[in-house]
């Protein structure tokens, strides 16, 4: 045998690195290993980083600071499955950190992550890729990237995965994505509802819960509800409700059912299958507040459909809701109240709550929870709308007091609802009186000052409903409510402006309120509104006319016209023509002005501090106007004697100096100017006057005159606190008495007008021929009256030489007193006239449609008593120069 030769060991290649085992305890070292070209090292480094990231948020932040994210993103596309899997596991954990999510969006790794969802990949990769997407989908920008890169379809496919973690992550991501409408639409196109319904059979509650939440979102769309119904989704939901062990899913299941009940077809189907009855019974018997609340919400959502309301009524849903009102949960009370509000659109439902439900709702008005009070007030508002019976039931349940308390609530919705209920109640007079006794006007002061348009609108409407009598309007004025009410007329909101106009129209129902509203600028605002085609409304026009019709002095000054329905009352004054928007001073302000050379202000006042003596009544009782001038003159002399005894004659020439006479007269006429004078001062003046007047007279005559002077009205001695009254006009009082006794009994209207015209002409200077009109010195007479009265205001009865507009005003004032309809028109150049309507005597008694009455102008100047047909030549000559 030959000798064995020993083989020589070959040395290792020079370019091969000797293996080295490294143990590192620093994350930074491992992060550096992510750049290694060796697959084994990459896999081990990723595994170590995964374990490190699992330990907490601080470690995730550390990895981000060490720059681990960017090299890891490159490993998502590595050829080695282990490296790729381990890198994906890291991102599944790291993506819960908000800073990491932000960086991942910037690095645009979404395509790489979604690619890991392909069927060829391992289940572990599916798990962590879906987990990464679930974390990324929490933020809106992440949702957009997932959707735009086609992530929805593979996620839906993974719902059928055998791994529960994959299912859980996928349905969670889908739930986040479907918050966006576009994703919901795409989900339906991808037929995602069947696999989602299948998840309801899962043995894992979290998967079932996420599936129900997803269905609760997507069934907000009608198409999704249809697909759910076609795939027997309602059966799945009903079974969940019937299973007590799944009580943690009942709330979400009811939310899905609530959406489905919005469809009439679904409602009918549930009614036919008995599912609806089961749902209502379940809600009524449940002791879980959230279940009761969601059941009530389901009813409320479905009840907005008219057909659904009918079905609910057939299922006696009202009883269920009344039971829910007694829940201990405020949320359930709110939801039940809202459901009742929706059901009230159905008349049968509204009638049911008349006997049951309203007392329970009224109790909720006293709740400490303001949201409960708001919901209860909403239910009561809908229950009482167009339902006097329910309004009475609410009042009987003592709802008025808590409703008025709610008007001071901090929640605008509660205030608006409470105001609506009070408005509905106030349509009935007995309830309105009760509401007024609770100081409703003072309670509305806060809502009228609100900046919320809904509160403003309802508050103004409540004012319109409750300010129907003088006491309520006075209460509103005294508490300062007119100022904010007028301010609401400036609103840019159409409903606020309309309701404010309505309230102003109601408040202008009496003259003092109309005058006050005009003083606050309501008339000017309404005039401006009515000039705008876009802002005006029927109520603004009606309010404007109502203000003028109850403030005739302003109306006549602005428009120069009073219709036959505009009845002149005591205190009316003719200031003369003013331009629209110009402020008209009050009568008191005009009376207190210094004497000026402007046009005299004519006053109509039948109220007097003194009354005609009994002898006057006796004398005038047998006097019919038109018998003789002497009879009329005797009456006039009697009235003059009375007036002279008090004021001094304004027309007769006196032998005493004018200064003494005018001093006494002015103090008797304008009580404001003599308020501060003491009685001793007045007696001193009167005594001086009597001493001067009594020279050469007998002692008994002096005593008589002294008694007459001391019989002056006592307003010269009044205190400053005494209420101001317009200057009295005893002459006009006599006129009213005379025409009432002599002209009112006349049966024929035309004869009444003619006799009254002659009477007025006689009191104002008699017949004036046209050719002597220029010689009729009425201006001097008026100036003398102003000087004697020391006032710019002249009572109409004092005028004995009157021109057209004086006579027309006196005719209108007297005609209104005896019920003779006539209008008053202001012309140019001191012209004024009255228009009357008369039926043609020849057509009286004829059968069939009668022609309209003819209009005439009453001649008070040239031929007193003549009736001039309107628009005739004679009438035009009377009206115009």
UniProtKB/Swiss-Prot annotation:
Palmitoylation is important for its function in autophagy. Disruption phenotype: Mice have normal viability but show complete male infertility. Autophagic degradation of cytosolic ribosomes is blocked in ARMC3-deficient spermatids, which causes low energy levels of mitochondria and motionless sperm flagella. The gene is Armc3. Testis-specific. SMART domains: ARM (SM00185). Residues 605-659 are annotated as: Disordered. Residues 622-636 have a biased composition (Low complexity). Changing residue 507 to A: Reduced level of palmitoylation and inability to rescue the autophagic flux in ARMC3-deficient embryonic fibrobalsts. InterPro entries: ARM-like, ARM-type_fold, Armadillo, Armadillo-Ser/Thr_Kinase, EDR1/CTR1/ARMC3-like_pept-like. It comes from Mus musculus (Mouse). Essential for male fertility and sperm motility. During spermatogenesis, promotes the autophagic degradation of excessive ribosomes, providing energy resources for mitochondria and thus ensuring sperm flagellar motility. GO terms for biological process: flagellated sperm motility; ribophagy; spermatid development. ARM repeats lie at residues 15-54, 57-96, 98-138, 140-179, 181-220, 222-262, 264-304, 306-345, 346-385, 388-427, 429-468, 470-509. This is Armadillo repeat-containing protein 3. The lineage of its organism: Eukaryota, Metazoa, Chordata, Craniata, Vertebrata. Changing residue 518 to A: Reduced level of palmitoylation and inability to rescue the autophagic flux in ARMC3-deficient embryonic fibrobalsts. Pfam families: Arm (PF00514), EDR1_CTR1_ARMC3_pept (PF14381). It comes from the Eukaryota. The keyword Repeat applies. Signal peptide: none annotated. Homodimer. Interacts with PIK3C3, PIK3R4 and BECN1. Interacts (via ARM domains) with ATG14. The keyword Acyltransferase does not apply.
């Amino acid at each position: 045998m030959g000798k064995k030769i020993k083989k020589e060991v070959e040395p290792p290649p020079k370019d091969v690195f000797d293996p080295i085992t490294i143990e590192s305890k620093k994350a930074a070292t491992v992060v550096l290993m992510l750049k290694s070209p060796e697959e084994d090292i990459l896999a081990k480094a990723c595994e170590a980083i995964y374990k490190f990231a699992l330990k907490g948020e601080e470690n995730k932040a550390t990895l981000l600071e060490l720059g681990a994210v960017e090299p890891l993103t490159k490993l998502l596309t590595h050829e080695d499955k282990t490296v790729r899997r381990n890198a994906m596991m890291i991102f599944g954990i790291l993506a819960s950190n908000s800073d990491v999510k932000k960086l991942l969006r910037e690095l645009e790794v979404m395509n790489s992550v979604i690619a890991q969802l392909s069927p060829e990949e391992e289940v572990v990769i599916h798990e962590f890729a879906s987990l990464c997407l679930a974390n990324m989908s929490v933020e809106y920008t992440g949702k957009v990237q997932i959707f735009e890169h086609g992530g929805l379809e593979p996620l839906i496919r993974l719902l059928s995965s055998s791994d529960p973690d994959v299912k859980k992550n996928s349905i969670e991501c889908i739930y986040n994505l479907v918050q966006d409408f576009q994703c919901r639409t795409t989900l339906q196109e991808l037929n995602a509802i069947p696999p989602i319904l299948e998840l309801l059979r899962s043995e894992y509650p979290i998967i079932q819960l996420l599936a129900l939440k997803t269905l609760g979102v997507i069934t907000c769309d009608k198409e999704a509800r249809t697909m759910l119904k076609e795939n027997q989704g309602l059966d799945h939901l009903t079974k969940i409700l019937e299973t007590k062990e799944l009580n943690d899913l009942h709330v979400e299941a009811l939310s899905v059912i609530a959406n489905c009940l919005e469809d009439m077809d679904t409602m009918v189907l549930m009614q036919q299958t008995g599912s609806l009855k089961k749902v209502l019974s379940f809600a009524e018997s449940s002791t879980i507040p959230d279940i009761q609340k969601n059941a009530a919400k389901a009813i409320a959502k479905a009840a907005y459909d008219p057909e659904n309301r009918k079905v609910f009524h057939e299922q006696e849903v009202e009883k269920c809701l009344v039971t829910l009102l007694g829940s201990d949960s405020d949320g359930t009370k709110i939801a039940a109240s809202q459901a009742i509000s929706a059901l009230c659109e159905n008349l049968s439902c509204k009638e049911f709550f008349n006997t049951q439900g309203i007392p329970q709702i009224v109790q909720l008005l006293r709740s400490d929870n303001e949201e409960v009070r708001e919901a209860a007030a909403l239910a009561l508002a809908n229950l009482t709308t167009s339902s006097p019976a329910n309004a009475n039931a609410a009042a009987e349940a003592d709802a008025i007091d808590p409703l008025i308390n709610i008007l001071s609530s901090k929640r605008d919705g509660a205030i608006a609802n409470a105001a609506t209920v009070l408005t509905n109640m106030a349509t009935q007079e007995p309830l309105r009186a009760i509401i007024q006794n609770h100081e409703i006007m003072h309670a509305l002061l806060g809502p009228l000052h609100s900046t919320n348009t809904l509160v403003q609108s309802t508050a103004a409407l409540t004012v319109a409903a409750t300010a129907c009598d003088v006491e309520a309007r006075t209460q509103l004025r005294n508490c300062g409510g007119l100022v904010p009410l007028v301010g609401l007329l400036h609103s840019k909101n159409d409903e606020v402006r309309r309701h404010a106009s309505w309230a102003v129209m109601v408040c202008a129902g009496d003259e003092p309120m109309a005058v006050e509203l005009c003083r606050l600028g309501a008339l000017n605002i309404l005039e401006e509104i009515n000039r705008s085609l876009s802002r005006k409304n029927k109520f603004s026009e009606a309010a404007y006319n109502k203000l003028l019709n109850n403030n005739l002095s302003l109306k006549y000054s602005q428009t120069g016209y009073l219709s036959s329905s505009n009845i002149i009352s005591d205190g009316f004054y003719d200031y003369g023509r003013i331009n629209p928007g110009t402020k008209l001073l009050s009568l008191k302000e005009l009376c207190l002005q210094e004497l000026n050379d402007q046009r005299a202000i004519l006053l109509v006042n039948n109220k007097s501090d003194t009354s005609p003596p009994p002898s006057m009544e006796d004398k005038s009782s047998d006097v019919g106007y038109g018998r003789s001038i002497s009879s009329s003159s005797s009456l006039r002399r009697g009235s003059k004697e009375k007036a002279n005894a008090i004021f001094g004659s304004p027309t007769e020439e006196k032998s005493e100096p004018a200064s003494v006479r005018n001093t006494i007269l002015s103090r008797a006429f304008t009580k404001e100017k003599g308020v501060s004078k003491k009685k001793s001062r007045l007696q001193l003046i009167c005594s001086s006057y009597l001493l001067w007047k009594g020279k050469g007279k007998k002692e008994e005559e002096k005593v008589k005159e002294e008694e007459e002077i001391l019989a002056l009205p006592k307003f010269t001695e009044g205190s400053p606190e005494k209420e101001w009254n317009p200057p009295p006009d005893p002459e006009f009082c006599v006129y009213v008495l005379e025409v009432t006794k002599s002209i009112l009994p006349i049966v024929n209207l035309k004869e009444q007008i003619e006799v009254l015209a002659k009477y007025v002409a006689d009191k104002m200077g008699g017949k004036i021929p046209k050719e002597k009109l220029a010689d009729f010195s009425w201006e001097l007479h008026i100036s003398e009256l102003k000087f004697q009265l020391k006032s710019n205001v002249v009572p109409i009865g004092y005028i004995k030489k009157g021109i057209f507009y004086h006579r027309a005003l006196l005719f209108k004032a007297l005609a209104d007193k005896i019920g003779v309809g006539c209008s008053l028109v202001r012309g140019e150049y001191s012209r004024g006239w009255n228009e009357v309507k008369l039926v043609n005597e020849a057509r009286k008694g004829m059968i069939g449609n009668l022609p309209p009455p003819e209009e005439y102008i009453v001649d008070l100047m040239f031929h007193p008593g003549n009736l001039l047909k309107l628009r005739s030549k004679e009438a035009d000559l009377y009206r115009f120069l």
